[in-house]
From Swiss-Prot:
The keyword Ligase applies. ATP binds at residues 19-24, 76. It comes from Chlorobium phaeobacteroides (strain DSM 266 / SMG 266 / 2430). Residues 1-272 are annotated as: Amidoligase domain. GO terms for cellular component: cytosol. The active site is at residues 390, 516, 518. The keyword Metal-binding applies. Belongs to the CTP synthase family. Mg(2+) binds at residues 76, 146. One of its GO terms (biological process) is pyrimidine nucleobase biosynthetic process. Residues 299-543 form the Glutamine amidotransferase type-1 domain. This is CTP synthase. SUPFAM superfamilies: Class I glutamine amidotransferase-like, P-loop containing nucleoside triphosphate hydrolases. Its EC number is 6.3.4.2.
């Protein structure tokens, strides 16, 4: 595949340790370049052999981020969208598994004309062709590619070799490498240590790549002497050693990099003309609202199955930051482990003291389901603002059917195939699907909102498009029974068959959605559902918290279903 001309490439690599923030660095740099008038896109290359992260455990991978076109991708794409305010796509995330699968498929179909298929050139050429895929669409000025993993990992070597070859082919004015490293602060010596960075650069040099710019993560700011030392030992100009010390919120990172002039150094090295001066007043204002809210604090209880690993709910947590800023309050998250409410000893009155809203998060499988249902019942009966997302909406339906409509065995066929009242059931088009990977209802779908509903008050329009990731849906057989008891089906697919939004008539704020609104919340455009939920929690905190909670939650009594796993 011919590579598009005039597109400048920036590759972001990482060294010393993982989780330094390559995704935040890539997103921040992209935002700065966009603010100067350049057209920017970002993509993530992951070295694992999975074709995509769709079947990976949240404990290993964290959140699976779904794009409009239905790709199941790395959570870093969420950062790209939130910082750039640009949609990503299937082409924005490539795994080594997808590369190998493509090469093997081509070999099986005879595309290599009987040749011996090898890492060099076939796998490397496949990577380079994929790198050009995003560049050829969208009339780009700059394409930023984040390479996952840490320098020294054997899995990342093909990506690094592809980058090395591309730099040789394209020239230094068209491709540069930004290497993110770690400069630890040793408290006993009161000193920043540069040796790990030196060794990381040495390992990068062994692959044939000389970094053009070093970004050094550290606990404390880097002095000029430290920058000079790093530059001297790593063969990098002192001006190209960028300090990035710890900050209170990731949204401060673009402002820190602007102060360090990273964007100007990148533009100079790539021969980009000096575009307009960036106007980041809106970003500074957002950071100020995040760090210094003027209207108090609300606590939101987030009930989930993977609360030991908050990255499983990354977009939800970020959406609450956006909604907090838009409501001028600090949102404190209290993670609620669903299984705790199944043990029979969970003290709702004590543990939920001070909680002004309950969100039941997405997930899969029957572990913790009865606990989620208990939290939903508590929020419904205590009139606490409630928000259910995907599985959270399905659990809210089950709880309402059991405890309000008298369908005591109500359940989802995902958890109990023999339930007498399958209020949640497998979608018809999913019943013949055998494979797991990439086969759910994925991506953006339209939803029609009912006039006069809370959902309409929130969105203020009839037609919306939201992203989905599910196999199960509300069973329309039970729609009338639930409507008679006060449930409102306020959002459906255009043909009216698939329930997208539920709410309760006689509750201050009780909304469940089949889709994932957290995936579309951004700094400049907070998602209306999160804004509305936090606003309701803020109102609850101000007023209803003064009232005594008079109804005690009964001890947890599991429904006679299949044993929980």
């Amino acid at each position: 595949m011919a590579r598009p001309k005039n597109v400048k490439h920036i590759f972001v690599t990482g060294g010393v340790i993982s989780s330094l923030g390559k995704g935040i660095l890539s997103a921040s740099l992209g935002m700065l370049l966009k603010s100067r008038g350049l057209k920017v896109a970002i993509q993530k290359y992951d070295p694992y052999i999975n074709v995509d992260p769709g079947t990976m455990s949240p404990y290993q991978h964290g959140e699976v981020y779904v794009t409009d076109d239905g790709a199941e991708t790395d959570l870093d794409l969420g950062h790209y969208e939130r910082f750039l305010d640009e949609a990503t796509s299937q082409a924005s995330n490539l795994t080594m598994g997808r590369v190998y699968k493509s090469v093997i498929d081509k070999e099986r179909s005879g595309e290599y004309l009987g040749g011996t298929v090898q890492v060099v050139p076939h796998v490397i050429d496949e990577i380079k062709d994929r790198m050009a895929e995003l560049a050829k669409n969208g009339n780009l000025d700059v394409l930023i590619t984040e390479i996952g993993g840490t320098i020294g990992d054997i899995e990342s070597l093909p990506f690094l070799e592809a980058m090395r070859q591309m730099k040789l082919e394209m020239g230094e004015r068209n491709l540069l490498n930004i290497h993110l490293t770690f400069v630890p602060y040793i408290k006993a010596a009161c000193e920043l240590k540069t040796k790990p960075t030196q060794h990381s650069v040495k390992m990068l040099l062994e692959t044939g790549i000389q970094p053009d710019i070093l970004v050094c993560r550290s606990e404390k700011p880097l002095s000029r002497e430290i920058k000079n030392k790093v530059g001297h030992f790593c063969n990098v100009n002192e001006l190209d050693v960028i300090g990035l010390n710890d900050c209170d919120t990731i949204y401060e990172v673009p402002l820190m990099l602007l102060k360090e002039k990273l964007d100007l150094r990148v533009m100079k090295k790539l021969g980009l003309k000096k575009f307009r001066e960036p106007n980041l007043e809106y970003w500074r204002d957002f950071c100020n609202k995040v760090l210094h809210p003027t209207e108090g604090e609300v606590t939101i209880g987030v009930c989930g199955k993977y609360t030991e690993y908050p990255d499983a709910y990354k977009s939800i947590l970020e959406a609450f930051i956006h909604a907090g800023a838009s409501n001028n309050v600090r949102v404190t998250i209290k993670l609620l482990r669903a299984e705790d409410a199944e043990a029979g000893s969970f003290d709702f009155k004590k543990e939920m003291q001070g909680v002004s809203g309950v969100l039941v998060a997405p997930g899969f499988g029957d572990r913790g389901i009865e606990g989620k249902i208990s939290f939903i019942r508590y929020a419904r009966e205590q009139n606490i603002p409630f928000f259910g997302i995907c599985l959270g909406m399905q659990c809210a339906t089950i709880e309402f059917a059991r405890n309000v409509c008298g369908l005591h065995d109500a359940n989802s066929t995902e958890f109990n195939k023999r339930t007498r009242f399958p209020v949640i059931d497998l979608m018809e088009q999913q019943k013949k699907v055998k494979e797991k990977g990439g086969t759910m209802r994925l991506g953006s779908y339209p939803c029609i909102i009912k006039e006069g509903s809370k959902a309409y008050d929130i969105y203020k329009k009839f037609l919306i498009n939201e992203r989905h990731r599910h196999r199960f849906e509300f069973n329309n057989t039970y729609r009338s029974a639930l409507e008679e008891q006060g449930m409102v089906f306020s959002g459906t697919s255009p043909n009216g068959e698939l329930v997208e939004i539920i709410e309760l008539k006689d509750h201050r704020w009780f909304v469940g959605v089949q889709f994932h609104p957290e995936l579309k919340s951004r700094v400049q455009q907070v998602h209306p559902l999160f804004h509305g939920f936090v606003a309701a929690a803020k109102e609850y905190e101000k007023g209803s918290r003064q009232m005594e909670l008079t109804v005690d939650m009964p001890s947890f009594m599991p429904v006679e279903n299949e044993p929980a796993q």
